[in-house]
Amino acid sequence: MANIEKKNNSELQEKLITVNRVSKTVKGGRIFSFTALTVVGNGEGRVGFGYGKAREVPAAIQKAMEKARRNMVTIPLVNKTLQHSLKGSHTGSNIFMKPASDGTGIIAGGAMRAVLEVAGIHNVLAKTYGSTNPINVVRATMNGLTNMKSPEMIAAKRNKLIEDILG
């Protein structure tokens, strides 16, 4: 698993999660191409992922980075951790994440760790169940993070005060 990190001029953190060689069988033999899975984030709650395919590795990575920048979403964080425990799933991958106290760090494995790092989440406990395919894990993580709601969002939806929501 390749894990390359880079910061560009607009302060976006870019991480390459995986590069994979795939083949298409035709009458004359095999045609090889490459796929790349990347995540991009600003370290303050904005994160996106991209999946690019091309005949050459650099082109696949570039396509994936562009898609990741286009598909960024904002995640409501509190004290560099999650608002509440959450679950996410995509096909065979299921993930569970819960907020952790200051100084815990990111306790997560593989592709999920890269997503959490570029999103700016510093304290979290996370576990992957089922398939550990990086593409499915990243999609499950993004599904979970986008479904996270802040107390302000819940209060606005219910037409109540934030104090009523927090108890």
Curated annotation (Swiss-Prot):
Pfam families: Ribosomal_S5 (PF00333), Ribosomal_S5_C (PF03719). GO terms for molecular function: rRNA binding; structural constituent of ribosome. One of its GO terms (cellular component) is small ribosomal subunit. It comes from the Bacteria. Gene3D superfamilies: 3.30.160.20, 3.30.230.10. Disulfide bonds: none annotated. Residues 12-75 form the S5 DRBM domain. PROSITE patterns: RIBOSOMAL_S5, S5_DSRBD. InterPro entries: Ribosomal_Su5_D2-typ_SF (IPR020568), Ribosomal_uS5 (IPR000851), Ribosomal_uS5_bac-type (IPR005712), Ribosomal_uS5_C (IPR005324), Ribosomal_uS5_N (IPR013810), Ribosomal_uS5_N_CS (IPR018192), Ribsml_uS5_D2-typ_fold_subgr (IPR014721). Keywords: Ribonucleoprotein, Ribosomal protein, RNA-binding, rRNA-binding. Belongs to the universal ribosomal protein uS5 family. The N-terminal domain interacts with the head of the 30S subunit; the C-terminal domain interacts with the body and contacts protein S4. The interaction surface between S4 and S5 is involved in control of translational fidelity. With S4 and S12 plays an important role in translational accuracy. Located at the back of the 30S subunit body where it stabilizes the conformation of the head with respect to the body. This is Small ribosomal subunit protein uS5. It comes from Buchnera aphidicola subsp. Schizaphis graminum (strain Sg). The gene is rpsE.
